């Protein structure tokens, strides 16, 4: 599960009350918030990969991966840092991280087909060091712990579009993140559904905003909008 954008429209930063609790933010439920949708999507993608060796488009575009990689390089993040890709999907982000020299990379997805695809993609690229597991981040296994960096590129968005009690699932996500991220660890999140302030409000317990990464902004009608928000949080000690 990677990208849960509810729409492709530009999101106005002034659209919602910046002090509104995430539990009160009501997105229209979507098939993008269901496991069945992603199982079917990755079944199709795996079939295409087996036939042609090609993966589908990178969610949020390749610039989303470049943005993360550039930030990690800029801040001299140690290459052996334990990293977890939450909802790894086809595993392309982990492959790019491995190519950049990072050596302690893990990825989870609740779709077994996604994990199968990610393993196939990594193998094709000659990368055999990735630790890939089928796991539901909302109900993490005991081995999911003590990561120095966690990355989310669309999974939090998808969960917010669930038909079944999304507010509770988002709270579980937050708690799971606090459980697996080391004190002082970093959380990088890319979202197309949530504004900066909404994400800060949601993750304010146990996490502090470290930086907002630059993304394209749009100005119209006297307002500012964006299609994606990328934030870096730090786990409080």
Language-model features: where?
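A short acidic, Gly/Pro-enriched loop at the edge of an enzyme's catalytic core
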Residues: 138-150
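Class I S-adenosyl-L-methionine
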Residues: 196-237
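Class I SAM-dependent methyltransferase SAM/SAH-binding core
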Residues: 82-84, 89-140
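N-terminal auxiliary segments of SAM/dcSAM-dependent transferases
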Residues: 1-40
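Conserved alpha-helix/loop element of class I SAM-dependent methyltransferases that forms part
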Residues: 58-81
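A short glycine-rich, Lys/Arg-flanked "PGG" loop and its adjoining helix->strand segment in the class I
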Residues: 166-183
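A short SAM/SAH-binding and catalytic strip from SAM-dependent methyltransferases
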Residues: 148-167
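Conserved beta-strand signature within the Rossmann-like core of class I S-adenosyl-L-methionine
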Residues: 184-191
């Amino acid at each position: 599960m990677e990208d849960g954008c509810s729409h492709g429209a530009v999101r106005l930063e002034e659209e919602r009350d910046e002090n509104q609790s995430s539990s009160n933010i009501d997105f229209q439920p979507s098939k993008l918030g269901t496991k069945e949708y992603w199982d079917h999507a990755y079944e199709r993608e795996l079939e295409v990969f087996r036939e042609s060796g090609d993966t589908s488009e990178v969610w949020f575009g390749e610039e989303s991966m470049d943005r993360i990689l550039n930030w990690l390089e800029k801040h001299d993040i140690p290459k052996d840092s334990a990293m977890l890709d939450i909802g790894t999907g086809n595993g392309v982000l982990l492959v790019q991280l491995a190519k950049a020299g990072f050596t302690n990379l893990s990825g989870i997805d609740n779709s077994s087909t996604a994990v199968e695809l990610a393993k196939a993609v990594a193998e094709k690229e000659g990368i055999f060091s990735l630790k890939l597991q089928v796991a539901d981040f909302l109900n993490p296994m005991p081995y999911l712990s003590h990561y120095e960096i966690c990355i989310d590129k669309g999974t939090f968005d998808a969960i917010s579009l669930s038909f079944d009690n999304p507010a509770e699932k988002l709270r579980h996500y937050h708690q799971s993140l606090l459980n697996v991220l080391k004190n002082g660890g970093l959380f990088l999140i890319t979202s197309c559904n949530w504004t900066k302030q909404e994400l800060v409000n949601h993750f304010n317990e146990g996490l502090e905003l470290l930086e907002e990464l630059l993304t394209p902004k749009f100005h119209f009608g006297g307002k500012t909008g964006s299609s994606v928000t990328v934030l870096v949080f730090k786990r409080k000690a």
